[in-house]
């Protein structure tokens, strides 16, 4: 068995016998997560050598369903997903809070979703056409993660728009960046993590 895999979850049962839909509490090293009986979390952790889960920073836009699905998936894989809005402000500016939380992580996942729409044209003689594009803070944080971790430690997860992946406008600097498709089973994300070096960071 891999020595980096540790048990880190305790299930605290609900002792209320009058409630048929009992809810258990999952205690992790860093947070408390409510878990009903239909969700079985993996109780193995990817350790960084100090009996702590490897932290991964998640950049996201307004697609809350995808955000929560990816976060839960990473937790089940043994990582500690970090979402900026869940962390206390402690009087910090947004950029200070961003810098602090990213500095504690080993790699990042950018969920690129087409949250905004605008009109553009290719040249002065063209008609305006409607385009979708990610929120600008997502693009900014994408670049920040690349500068912090390097391209090899930043996973670009593309949420389809009108049935096509990366079917939205991006800065030209990012057009050559290889992305993986978001799917309901997150299989491509799982393969990227398993076959990459993310568990050894």
Curated annotation (Swiss-Prot):
Residues 52-186 form the TIR domain. GO terms for biological process: signal transduction. One of its GO terms (molecular function) is NADP+ nucleosidase activity. InterPro entries: CAP12/PCTIR_TIR_dom, TIR_dom, Toll_tir_struct_dom_sf. Transmembrane segments: none annotated. Induction: Up-regulated by phagocytic stimuli. This is Protein tirC. It comes from Dictyostelium discoideum. The lineage of its organism: Eukaryota, Amoebozoa, Evosea, Eumycetozoa, Dictyostelia. The gene is tirC.
């Amino acid at each position: 068995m891999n020595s980096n895999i540790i048990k880190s979850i305790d299930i605290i049962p609900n002792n209320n016998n009058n409630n048929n839909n009992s809810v258990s509490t999952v205690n992790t090293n860093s947070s408390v997560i409510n878990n009903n009986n239909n969700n079985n979390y993996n109780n193995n952790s990817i350790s960084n050598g100090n009996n702590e889960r490897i932290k991964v920073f998640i950049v996201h836009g307004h697609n809350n369903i995808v955000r929560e699905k990816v976060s839960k998936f990473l937790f089940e894989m043994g990582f500690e997903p970090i979402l900026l809005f869940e962390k206390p402000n402690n009087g910090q500016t947004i950029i200070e809070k961003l810098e602090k939380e990213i500095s504690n992580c080993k790699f990042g996942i950018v969920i690129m979703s087409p949250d905004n729409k605008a009109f553009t044209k290719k040249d002065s003689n063209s008609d305006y056409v409607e385009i979708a594009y990610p929120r600008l803070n997502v693009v900014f944080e994408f670049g920040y993660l690349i500068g912090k971790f390097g391209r090899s430690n930043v996973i670009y997860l593309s949420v389809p728009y009108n049935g096509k992946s990366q079917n939205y406008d991006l800065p030209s600097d990012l057009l050559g960046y290889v992305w993986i498709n978001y799917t309901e089973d997150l299989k491509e994300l799982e393969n990227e993590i398993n076959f990459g070096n993310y568990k050894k960071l």
